[in-house]
UniProtKB/Swiss-Prot annotation:
Protein role: Insecticidal to house crickets. It induces an excitatory slow-onset impact that leads to irreversible spastic paralysis. It also modifies human voltage-gated potassium channel Kv1.5/KCNA5. Most likely, it binds to the voltage-sensing domain of the channel, suggesting it does not block the pore but prevents its opening at physiological membrane potentials. The recombinant peptide binds to the channel in an irreversible manner and slows down the hKv1.5 current activation kinetics. It is not toxic to mice, when intracranially injected (at 0.5 ug/g mouse).
Protein name: U2-lycotoxin-Ls1b
Expressed in which tissues: Expressed by the venom gland.
Cell compartment(s), UniProt: Secreted
Keyword match Magnesium: no
Organism: Lycosa singoriensis (Wolf spider)
Length: 105
């Protein structure tokens, strides 16, 4: 009986330690995201400028502009993404951008 209690207590401690590590990782990721949003707030790229395809469309200036990348751009070294005009749903998607005050009237 005591063995079962000790084993279950060790199991609880192990699970608790893993959840603490996950929480620390989540806090680090949140801090990195906050830094990225601070960058996005500071600058918005003009239409036609080279943008980072791995980031959100918020980096492009204007409600309907998005970061458009060529087909299979990740596998080509010379391929660059550019801020190009998108569809109306791009403006709907960009309503949640932190830097929307720069282009909204």
């Amino acid at each position: 009986m005591i063995k079962y209690v000790l084993i279950s207590a060790l199991l609880v401690v192990a699970v608790y330690s893993f959840t603490i590590e996950d929480n620390e990782d989540a806090l680090l990721e949140e801090a990195e995201d906050e830094l990225d949003t601070e960058e996005e707030r500071r600058m918005a790229l003009p239409p036609g400028a080279v943008c980072n395809g791995h980031k959100s469309d918020c980096q492009c200036f204007g409600a309907k502009y998005k970061c458009s990348c060529p087909f299979l751009w990740r596998f080509r070294r010379s391929a660059e993404c550019h801020c190009k005009k998108g569809w109306a749903w791009t403006a709907i998607k960009k309503r949640s951008c932190h830097n929307r005050y720069q282009w909204s009237g």
